[in-house]
Amino acid sequence: MLPLTLKELRGKVVLVHFYAFQCHNCHANFEIYRRWHEQWREKGVVVVGIQTPETSQERDPAAVKSAAAERKLEFPIMVDVASKNWDAWENTMWPTVYVVDKNGYLRQWWQGELNWKGATGDKSIEQGVAQLLAEP
């Protein structure tokens, strides 16, 4: 698959999530990202993972591909070896998910585990996505 750009995804709601496969907190969100992909892929929502490595193993595209397959993550994933995307988004922590509307504007984000200690980040993002899908 060729690299994706937000420009190519105009007209769709895009969920961009930054993570590292060896990040414990990131693991807690994988099931939610997988659910979102399955739930919304036919409705104009694209989930994109950006693996920003902390360790040498996380820099290896084959290891990233294997880890994604093991976790049944079937959405597009890129390896941000030089942290260029991390820096461009001014991201500060793993995991973080950004919600981009159909026009390419950042509308919502969540940093950390979506459901850490009773938080309802997944529900907040889901409500935001539903609202964006309802917009013309």
How should these model regions be labeled?
Residues 99-136:
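Thiol-/selenol-based redox modules, centered on thioredoxin-like
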Residues 18-20, 50-53, 80-82, 110-113:
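Active-site-proximal beta-strand/loop segments in catalytic clefts of secreted hydrolases
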Residues 1-4, 83-85:
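Short loop/turn elements that flank and shape the SAM/SAH-binding pocket of Class I
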Residues 27-71, 81-88:
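Structural microenvironment flanking redox-active thiols in thiol-disulfide oxidoreductases
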Residues 4-27, 47:
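Short active-site neighborhood of thiol/selenol oxidoreductases, capturing the structured segment around
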Residues 11-14, 43-46, 73-75, 102:
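Loop/turn elements at helix/coil->beta-strand transitions in domains of secreted/extracellular proteins
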Residues 31-34, 62, 95, 123, ...:
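Surface-exposed alpha-helical interface segments used for non-catalytic interactions
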